[in-house]
Amino acid sequence: MRVFGKINIIGLDNGYGNIKTANGIFPASVTCCEAEPAHAQDVLVYDGKYYVIGAGHREFTLDKVGNQDHYLLTLAGIGQELWCNQLTTAAVHLAVGLPLTWVGDQREQFRAYLSQNRHVDFNWRGINYHVDLVGVDVYAQGYSAVIPELRKFTGANMLCDIGNGTMIVMAINDRKPV
């Protein structure tokens, strides 16, 4: 997480196998429970429902917005980052990734999906969080990993992002993705 003024920028990789942030990684699975789970550690409470996060494995689908799973996983990722930075109330701008081949078709849909609530209250691992979601940017997965070193990418280069169900290859010519 990076702080610019009063805005907390959280980078989050919404993978199919795992959700990754700067300070954590957990399996990308969601199980809804009727009552508070007795022994689960990674519990998200949102909209009056209990969700166990990371206790299983999701099936691969081509659409991340078909249900609430990736929204809930994103809330857990936000909670993880805020906890690591000792915050419970924050203005958050998300920087998230989609596979390169999906960015063109799904960028706006995924941005709208993650932006469905400007003000979000939830509980992650027993701590209440209050988030003002001020923005969402969607990037090609893997590209963010090379941005700090982009000045070194002269000539023709290839970036390979291997995920759980995806493998994306991106050409980078003279510091620009093609």
Regions found by a protein language model. Give the residues of each.
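Short, acidic (Asp/Glu-rich) active-site segment that either coordinates a divalent metal cofactor
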Residues: 168-173
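Active-site-proximal alpha-helical scaffolds that flank and shape metal-associated catalytic sites
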Residues: 160-165
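Nucleotide/phosphate-binding catalytic cleft detector across ATP-hydrolyzing
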Residues: 1-159, 175-178
